[in-house]
Regions:
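Hydrophobic/small/kink-forming positions within alpha-helical transmembrane segments
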Residues: 14, 18, 45, 72-77, ...
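Membrane-interface interhelical linkers
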Residues: 1-12, 20-68, 79-89, 137-155, ...
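Juxtamembrane helix-loop boundary signature in multi-pass membrane transporters
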Residues: 1-8, 103-161, 268-289
């Protein structure tokens, strides 16, 4: 039964970007991020209740709380950049670049956490890095540089950078407390950050203007994230992590498949090879972890 939960985790994670893209055709990406974070926050605290770890709040010291807040701020910045990139660019290019945060995370872990590097890790990094570079064309760079406000590429790269910082800060902050509780606290920080961004940019007036259809898609993207978390947790409870984690990492393929079906986005031959390299590298990294 756990295999179905693992597949469900990958599926729901994969369709999150698709649902979000459908919800930000006219809606400002910052507003959409703030709305969906409300839904994600409910799921994150639901996970805390399910695992019965809410009592650990009283045991969190000042240092741990500080790093959890910093991690939450990095997560918020990553989400804001990610959905802005999705609004401006193609899913089949934004998502693979965002996934390259794995490379940065490992490099930062090596520098700041002094984690070891195995031969398998190096091969995985080379595959993911090479695959990501193959996804970016010269035309993408030229278009991005030609826009005063910045195109999708710069936001996709920033999303990956902030996501990598999230994992490092989160690892430091989550030491000694349950990961589900840590995630819930981080998501709470993200919620405040997202709504502050909405009010600072004066976008709060647009909330009333959101079309019902787009509001539904934005909410569904949050539900998809929550459903993915629940399935992933259940799969890890019943099945081996060595199989569950790689299956979850295949969510990118689900995203790319739906981007072709829903938005008719097509990969170039070079891009397809890039996706293959990223997938192999990611799965290899998950299996050898």
């Amino acid at each position: 039964m756990w295999i179905f939960y693992a597949i469900g985790s990958s599926f729901f994670a994969g369709i999150t970007a698709i649902l979000a893209k459908c919800g930000i055709k006219k809606t400002d990406s910052n507003v959409a991020t703030a709305i969906r974070t409300v839904v994600v926050l409910l799921f994150s605290w639901l996970m805390v209740l399910i695992t019965g770890t809410w009592g650990g709040i009283m045991q969190i010291d000042g240092r741990t709380l500080l790093f959890l807040i910093l991690s939450g701020m990095a997560t918020g910045a990553s989400w804001l950049c990610y959905f802005h990139a999705l609004q401006k660019g193609d899913i089949n290019k934004v998502v693979p670049i965002d996934k390259s945060s794995t490379v940065l995370s490992i490099l930062l872990a090596l520098i700041f956490l002094h984690e070891g590097v195995t031969g398998a890790k190096i091969v995985s990094l080379v595959l993911i890095g090479s695959g990501t570079m193959m996804m970016i064309t010269k035309k993408d760079i030229e278009i991005d540089q030609g826009k005063k406000s910045g195109g999708w590429l710069i936001y996709a790269v920033l999303s990956a950078v902030f996501a990598s910082l999230t994992s490092i800060l989160g690892k430091i902050g989550i030491e000694g407390i349950d990961s589900n509780l840590g995630t819930a606290i981080r998501t709470t920080v993200v919620l405040f950050m997202a709504w502050i961004m909405v009010f600072v940019t004066g976008k709060q007036k647009e909330i009333k203007k959101i079309e019902k259809k787009e509001f539904c898609f934005i909410s569904l993207s949050g539900l998809a994230t929550g459903a993915s978390w629940l399935c992933y947790y259940r799969a890890l409870q019943e099945g081996p992590a060595s199989v569950v984690v790689p299956i979850d990492k295949l969510s990118m393929l689900v995203t790319l498949a739906f981007s072709w079906l829903v938005f008719h986005e097509r990969l170039t031959k070079k891009g397809a090879v890039g996706v293959l390299l990223i997938t192999v590298g990611t799965v290899m990294l998950a299996i050898t972890a």
